[in-house]
Design a protein with these regions (language model features):
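Extended amphipathic, helix-rich lipid-handling scaffolds
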Residues: 1-59, 72, 84-133, 148-180
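Short, low-complexity, polybasic intrinsically disordered segments
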Residues: 64-71
Length: 180
């Protein structure tokens, strides 16, 4: 028997802090996980799982999400993600002043590699449909341990509502351009 404050899985303090910060929710199936701890430090880890109706809060440059379904596989060195979701959403407060983006369809394939503080992410394909727009995208993101990182993105918009463009102009554009 355990109380509400007890943990069923032994995690290091940093992992516990991340769980409390992002508050993940949803269903997980076919979960396979392994880890190696040295004292209180998580040295090696690996996880593979299918998920449905996944949600988590945003934090810093990390996006939030709700209603996501798919598969994830990762370790401390690399990972891959496949999304196939109907009604869902992402939250990008570090990028957009109007951070909540709702989708009727969201499909994606991505992978990443980690070497020290350097993180390289490749978005193989993204397909999205929502009230404001529909289209596809692919690209890459590189984080070197400093600043927000560098993104190279190519997108094709098949349908867009011009009245909603202001919602998708990032903070970097400035309020004057959004209000124009």
């Amino acid at each position: 028997c355990s109380s509400a404050g007890d943990s069923l899985i032994a995690v290091d303090p940093r992992s516990r802090e991340l769980l409390e910060q992002y508050r993940p929710e949803g269903r997980v199936s076919e979960l396979r996980a392994s880890w190696t701890k040295l004292e209180d430090v998580l040295e090696h880890y690996a996880l593979k799982a299918n998920f449905s109706d996944l949600g988590l809060l945003p934090g810093g440059y990390f996006p939030g999400a709700k209603g996501l379904s798919g598969m994830i596989e990762f370790s401390e060195k690399s990972g891959s993600l496949a999304l196939d979701a109907g009604r869902s959403g992402i939250s990008l407060p570090a990028v957009f002043p109007e951070p909540e983006i709702a989708f009727d369809l969201l499909r994606a394939r991505a992978n990443w590699k980690v070497a020290g503080e350097v993180v390289d992410v490749k978005l193989e394909r993204l397909q999205f449909e929502g009230a404001d727009a529909a289209g596809t995208a692919s690209g890459s993101y590189r984080y070197t341990g400093e600043g927000p990182g560098v993104i190279d993105l190519a997108a094709s918009i098949s349908r867009a509502d011009g009245r909603a463009v202001w919602r998708y102009l990032p903070h970097a554009v400035g309020a004057e351009a959004r209000d124009w």
